[in-house]
């Protein structure tokens, strides 16, 4: 059985050297080239302003205020993968 995980992320920007961070991560499981119903999705508080990237993904600072930080979801993500 071949198992793959497809990941998708939304970020505050592209350059980590400028402090940009992931604000949403999603993943789906693929078994033998078939997408399963097993999926993972979390919004993440980046501890910085979303900035101009809101124009691309529509995720606002206000929406992210009470979301968990990455270290609070990383174990769940690794378990899924």
What spans do the regions from the language model cover?
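Conserved non-catalytic scaffold segment of RNase H-like nuclease domains
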Residues: 1-5, 9-81
């Amino acid at each position: 059985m071949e198992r793959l995980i497809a990941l998708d992320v939304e970020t505050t920007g592209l350059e980590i050297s400028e402090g940009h961070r992931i604000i949403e991560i999603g993943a789906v499981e693929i078994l033998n080239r078939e997408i399963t119903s097993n999926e993972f999705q979390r919004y993440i508080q980046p501890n910085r302003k979303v900035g101009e990237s809101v124009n691309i993904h529509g995720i606002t600072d206000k929406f992210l205020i009470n979301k968990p930080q990455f270290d609070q979801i990383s174990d769940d993500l690794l378990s899924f993968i």
